[in-house]
């Protein structure tokens, strides 16, 4: 079940980003210290009263080259397409403006729940000024102050009340769910169509449990698959095609519902920052990952080209050192037959559970070979390790003091675990806990 999506919409300078940061809170500042993981605050996770959701800050989208009305229209279009609930932000100090009414006209047509929030109501005396906003036609306005954090609780209560009811996935546990993600025009649709063109593939399109998604179910060599596709691959909106940042929004829902994510790169264009950003979301979500370099037929090659590309990918995607790389051509179908076996392999690894005795032997040998360094006269002591989860495989290491588990030593233990067990294609998590 994908998390609900909330979009913050409003004309420029009403405080959208301030409210976004208030709602997201400290999560924005959590940055993994790994080269290549690029953070973009346009999209983040948040929680209210135990319910997690994703939130889009349309104010983080740079449309400065577009005319003013086009900026507003584009922001509203994102919200209408992507969100389950829309927060419409206005400025209480300025009253209802023509631009607010323009936004309202677009939002009327969305048929989405809309919570109207009046920002910059910084003291109780200003509450009398909110009544004009009833004229926008969205019911009770919620007075808030993004800068002081006032009124956000009532607003979020209203947002949470509009979340769609949770639905269980309707697919058997042994079905492998995967998605293709990447920038526009990297060839995701072409790869999908080439895969579905195989004789042994049985295709049926059914509506997915997630709004605006189409799940393609099919069977290949006796294994059932679900290709999770957001509308972005099938419905090409002008705004989405023209601005690469929007492809991240399209990818997020697919990532959340997938077991395996194929990150598609265009060989003709090379590696772009947006490729790394999208891949970073899949990594952070803990999904199994395959890097697929498409349009391999379209570039000049010699016997060294694959090695040069592989080294470049490993350098630029250091956080995906575990992900296998496949060089394919959707046009000629070169190496496409490798994808299904690889999807199966990384899916199996993603859900692999290892024996505790073997795991602890591996950790003991690792510590004996390379004890942790001293820190302020103290040394990390590992008592035992246990696997607490799969998808992704997650290991808790019980220690004398978690503060002594440095990032570099955590990475060392992860590498020893990878050497001992088949975890190709899947991230693994190593968490230090104090033994009680």
UniProtKB/Swiss-Prot annotation:
Q: Which Pfam families match?
A: KH_dom-like, MMR_HSR1
- Keywords, comma-separated and alphabetical: GTP-binding, Nucleotide-binding, Repeat, Ribosome biogenesis
* InterPro entries reported in the protein's UniProt record: G_ENGA, GTP-bd, GTPase_Der, KH_dom-like, KH_dom-like_a/b, P-loop_NTPase, Small_GTP-bd
Keyword set includes Metal-binding:
no
Query: Which residues take part in binding GTP 1?
Result: 10-17, 57-61, 119-122
| Entries under Gene3D superfamilies matching the protein | 3.30.300.20, P-loop containing nucleotide triphosphate hydrolases (3.40.50.300)
CDD domains reported for this sequence: EngA1 (cd01894), EngA2 (cd01895)
Which residues participate in GTP 2 binding? 182-189, 229-233, 294-297
Q: Which NCBIfam families match?
A: GTPase_EngA, small_GTP
Q: Fill in the subunit field for this protein.
A: Associates with the 50S ribosomal subunit.
Protein name as catalogued = GTPase Der
Quote the gene name from the UniProt entry. Answer: der
